[in-house]
Amino acid sequence: MCIRDSIVSDVRKTGLAIILTEILNKCINNFEVSPSLYVHIKKMIISFEHHDFNPVFGIFFVKEILHFFGINPQNNYDEKSPFFNISNGRFESKKDDFLKTNFPHKEFHQLLGMNIDTIFDMKLSVDKRREILALLLEYLSYHEILNQKQIQSVHVLQSIYD
């Protein structure tokens, strides 16, 4: 397979790329970003082209850009702090009212620890991917980086995940 054609020739990758572009566009329009963000995005796109499709990449991509907007979640998950808190951006002892009771906190913790070299090996169920994506979009919205209601393509992303 030609590396340059993999995103355009794989409908799943194309759909995911369109959705991530929309999310990124909405975030960048609200903030002045550094050139290092573009370097990081380029690295992620190249890696996305080189690997087989994995729907977890979309969630990973959104997680990776958080740092560039100054809201990188703290990965302090443990037995005493098993619940992620959107407003504080860290795991805490009490459940956050923003999140569903069955939110996959442990899997979110695992995602936060992943890097571009390991993300393509991660597997998550459809429901867990949806919950984590919803959390990340809510997190961006809570911190006023993204108006989640403006994102039109999330339903398309969910159909790709199924």
Residue ranges, per PLM feature:
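Non-catalytic alpha-helical scaffolds and adjoining flexible linkers that form interface surfaces
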Residues: 4-162
